[in-house]
Amino acid sequence: MKNIKKNSLINSFIFSKICVGSSMAYTDPTNFNVLLGYRKSLFALINPFSFQSSLKTCFIFLESFVKNKYDFIFIVDIKDSILFDKFYHVCKKKQYTLLKGSEMSTGFLTNKKILNTVIITIFLNHKKTELIQKEALLMNVPLISFSDLTSNKFSSSFYITGNYNSFLSQNLILTLLSICFEQKHEHS
């Protein structure tokens, strides 16, 4: 039997473009169509093509809102202080609202000007996402969610499922969002 080194195993995951998500026990049934396979108690394999497609579609969707000068309300659960500060400065520069998920409560949209507004939830748990979805539906505000497999994919206007537990995956999403908002658009 051939002995496999740890680095070669890590490289095989990276180069095979497999996205590893939560175990099947924590997966909402609405996300089964994006799974390639699973190990009952360990992890699920997310189809990388569906993930890349939903990510690309999301940023095209976001660009249209940016071009039309919509306001954004970000509700985040970013544990790393460096990533939070970095994203906070991007939001502050663009005058977008940034709220922590821990600060959310029922009725948070009632006192806000919501005309031409989009809510984006980033890395929230499914309970917070569902609370925000109810508010967004009542106020008729589009909701975009970056969340894991535990959330119902129909809980948002646009849902991007993935494994956002690591620093690198969170950094990637926040960097892509920052780039999307920093681009110069022909119509602006």
Task: Cite the ranges covered by each PLM segment.
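Ribosome large-subunit tunnel/peptidyl-transferase-proximal elements
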Residues: K2-N163, F167-S188
